[in-house]
């Protein structure tokens, strides 16, 4: 099959810990060269724009993808994401467990599909925002070498699951206000984060909705008991969880809360989160 109209930018995670992503990028480059598709690879330096390309293929994890959409927030080109990070949760939403070779073949034959993005305090995300306990987990992992999949996440959970204290929160949704001491709040566009925790099993990336899970006060014993249930995405009917679907949510707390956005740590006292329907175009 011929692809004369294509000119693909291969964009690789520009960090010191990008050996996996570089290896995948080199593999993709070989595959594209073998079928004579014009392309250019970007590693340590990314261009100001991709206007001279027909597609941008990003090789990295959720953090790399998040950095890309915030750096190129108005990009109209079709995008593809290849799993070159530790968790790769958004990639899983798009492509499941495809190999690189399978995905290249699949992407080359795909038509662009529009997917939603979220925005939290003026920063875009694709996967979700985690506030409270899982934000504390991401904070604990700062500066540490990440293990593949959810191994790093699990180890940090075991370290903190007993001693973490719920934080007072005020949550405002259209037509509803919730005041509660919260162990954890997830506001998701995708189904999972943390390298495989299915925090929002009903989430769909093009339905124009955010999936919100609010976990209130929960004893240490219950935390240990139900964390595997949350990992599997079987938690929505538990009595200590409030589940909502919404287009927007605002969350306040008297003190700064640990949080992450697509796995990238931040902390604040106020979160303003909205869905941006059909914001980006992806090949999958």
Predicted regions and their residues:
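A generic structural signal for short beta-strands and their flanking turns/coil linkers
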Residues: 165-167, 181-183, 206-211, 245-247
């Amino acid at each position: 099959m011929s692809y004369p109209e294509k000119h693909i930018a291969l964009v690789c995670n520009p960090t010191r810990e990008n050996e996996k992503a570089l290896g995948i990028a080199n593999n993709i480059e070989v595959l594209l060269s073998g079928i004579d598709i014009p392309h250019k690879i970007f590693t340590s330096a990314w261009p100001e724009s991709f206007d001279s390309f027909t597609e941008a293929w990003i090789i990295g994890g959720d953090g790399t993808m998040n950095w890309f959409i915030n750096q190129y927030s108005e990009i109209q080109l079709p995008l593809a994401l290849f799993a070159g990070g530790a968790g790769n949760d958004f990639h899983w939403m798009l492509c499941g467990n495809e190999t690189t070779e399978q995905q290249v073949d699949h992407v080359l034959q795909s038509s662009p599909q529009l997917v939603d993005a979220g925005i939290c305090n003026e920063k875009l995300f694709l996967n979700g925002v985690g506030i409270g306990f899982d934000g504390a987990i991401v904070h604990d992992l700062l500066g540490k070498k990440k293990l593949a999949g959810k191994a790093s996440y699990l180890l940090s959970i075991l370290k903190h699951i007993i001693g973490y204290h719920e934080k007072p929160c005020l949550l405002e949704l259209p037509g509803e206000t919730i005041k509660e001491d919260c162990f954890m709040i997830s506001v998701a566009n995708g189904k999972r984060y943390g390298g495989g925790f299915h925090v929002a099993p009903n989430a769909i990336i093009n339905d124009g909705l955010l999936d919100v899970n609010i976990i209130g006060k929960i004893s240490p014993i219950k935390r240990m008991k139900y964390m595997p249930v949350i990992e599997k995405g079987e938690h929505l009917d538990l009595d200590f969880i409030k589940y909502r679907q919404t287009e927007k949510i605002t969350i306040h707390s008297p003190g700064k809360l640990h949080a992450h956005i697509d796995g990238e740590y931040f902390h604040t006292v106020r979160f303003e989160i909205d869905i941006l329907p059909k914001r980006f175009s992806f090949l999958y």
